[in-house]
């Protein structure tokens, strides 16, 4: 009976070793490059980014490069390289970002907000200063604010 216990224990430890120890493919956990606050406001209403569907723990399509976690209101950036504001928005579940004909275009929950459309304005702010989201590379502590307004 003791022999079976030892065999099961050794098999269990061997099975866990891939989760607990770094191998040739990984040098350890990704480095936290930064975190800060984020708010998205569409026509005066804040998007509740604390909903489970936006959190890395619950989302099917989250990115380590830029993501949210349950339990706080911060964005997190991990990985090899920092991302731009635009890349961060594009990495969030249920959001997409593109730049076309000199205009910002954000899709949220299937609704497209195109800066080329009359009456549609997208404003990207970092620490209350307007930035070009395709050029601004996020830094630790940045307070991000995306304001989308439409007429009608």
Residue ranges and their predicted role:
Residues 1-14:
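N-terminal secretory signal peptides and thylakoid transit peptides that target proteins
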């Amino acid at each position: 009976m003791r022999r079976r216990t030892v065999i099961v224990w050794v098999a269990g430890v061997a099975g866990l070793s891939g989760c607990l120890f770094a191998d040739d493919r990984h040098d350890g956990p990704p480095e936290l490059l930064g975190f800060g606050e984020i708010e998205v406001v569409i026509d005066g209403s804040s998007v509740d980014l604390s909903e489970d569907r936006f959190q890395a723990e619950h989302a099917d399509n989250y990115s380590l490069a830029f993501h949210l976690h349950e339990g706080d209101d911060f964005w997190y950036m991990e990985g090899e390289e920092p991302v731009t504001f635009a890349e961060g928005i594009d990495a969030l579940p249920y959001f997409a970002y593109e730049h076309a004909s000199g205009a910002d275009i954000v899709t949220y929950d299937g609704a497209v907000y195109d800066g080329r459309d009359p009456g549609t304005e997208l404003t990207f702010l970092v620490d209350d200063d307007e930035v070009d989201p395709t050029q601004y590379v996020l830094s630790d502590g940045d307070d991000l604010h995306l304001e989308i307004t439409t007429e009608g």
